[in-house]
Design a protein with these regions (language model features):
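Conserved alpha-helix/loop element of class I SAM-dependent methyltransferases that forms part
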Residues: 111-132, 147
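Conserved class I S-adenosyl-L-methionine
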Residues: 232-255
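A short glycine-rich, Lys/Arg-flanked "PGG" loop and its adjoining helix->strand segment in the class I
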Residues: 215-230
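A conserved beta-strand element that flanks and buttresses the S-adenosyl-L-methionine
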Residues: 203
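Core SAM-dependent methyltransferase catalytic element
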Residues: 280-301
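Acceptor-substrate binding/catalytic loop of class I
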Residues: 255-271
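Class I SAM-dependent methyltransferase SAM/SAH-binding core
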Residues: 135-191
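Class I SAM-dependent methyltransferase Rossmann-like catalytic core
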Residues: 82, 87-117
Length: 301
């Protein structure tokens, strides 16, 4: 069960969903990440099946979002600091300190083993110039953040955005760990708080396939990019890698899942992404594919 699918299923029932998420949030321990993720997934599955008991109920919610759904700034990850208790703020800060080193260690180990080639390609295309103004869409767990930040030069500056306050704190922890310049901002990708033509490069590591309304996000990314800038993205190879778990609750076939994702405007594959970028005036400048993901760079045509 993943945020982007939950935000579609419950977009018109936010208060009920937020109440559940806030209750669940108080139970999670940031120092028991694997254990808590399993518990979170199990409890989320139970909640979804309780609120949406049948496949037809699920399809009805898909149809409602297809007709009327739109990006909203208050979502299931409504963890901006104004909506957090003091205890949750303290917990988020502690988590940042813990996660900064943890994410750095994970990235260092991954680069030393299975992830070296595609991470090196990604970072090489993000950090091309002598003074980069970097904008990362979707900080998430911080793997892509740490991959870039560890290689930043003295005059580079990093800005990361995520709708989740906890993920923003991941970026803060990583920046502190590597002693690099930058900040994390909790805001929506659908309406970025930046002027036009602000950043020299926009990047995202396994972030787009966790987002909904991707065309809106890409349009905003293009708006804040300088005329000679680049957009560099890492995306998963496996179709519906994360989304499939939600559809599996109701026994959807792959064909049914594909059709639902098309109707609700979720990211699907490289060809679809490149078509959207072409509509925005971008051409593919570089491409690399590994067993688990692909990396693509786009530049203005």
């Amino acid at each position: 069960m993943v945020y982007e699918m939950n935000e579609i299923l419950f977009w018109n029932d936010i208060p009920n969903y937020l109440a559940f998420m806030r209750e669940l949030e108080t139970k999670l321990n940031p120092n028991k990440i694997v254990e808590d993720r399993r518990k979170w997934a199990d409890e989320m599955a139970s909640f979804i099946l309780r609120e949406i008991p049948t496949k037809q109920d699920f399809l009805d919610r898909i149809a409602e979002y297809e007709r009327n759904g739109k990006p909203v700034s208050i979502t299931s990850r409504n963890l901006s600091c104004g909506n957090l208790s003091l205890e949750q703020l303290k917990k988020a800060d502690q988590n940042a300190r813990f996660r900064g080193k943890e994410r750095a260690d994970i990235v260092e180990q991954a680069i030393a083993n299975w992830a070296k080639d595609h991470v090196d390609f990604y970072v090489e295309h993000v950090l091309k110039q002598s003074q980069e103004n970097i904008f990362e869409m979707t900080i998430g767990g911080g793997f892509g953040t740490a991959s870039v930040v560890r290689s930043m030069k003295e005059n580079d500056f990093y800005t990361g955005v995520d709708i989740d306050f906890k993920c923003v704190k991941n970026a803060d922890g990583i920046l502190k760990h590597y002693d690099k310049h930058g900040c994390g901002i909790a805001t929506s990708l659908w309406n970025l708080p930046f002027d036009d033509e602000t950043f020299s490069v926009v990047c995202s590591y396994m972030g787009l396939d966790e987002c909904r309304e991707v065309p809106t996000i890409l349009k905003e990314a293009a708006r804040v990019l300088k005329p000679n800038g680049r957009i560099v993205l890492v995306c998963g190879n496996t179709k519906y890698r994360r989304l499939k778990r939600c559809f599996d609750l109701y026994g959807f076939t792959e064909e049914e899942t594909t059709e639902c994702c098309r109707r609700i405007r979720l990211y699907v594959d490289h060809a679809q992404l490149s078509d959207e970028m072409h509509r925005l005036g971008f051409a593919e400048a570089a491409y690399y594919q590994s067993d688990t993901c692909y990396v693509v760079e786009y530049t203005k045509m």
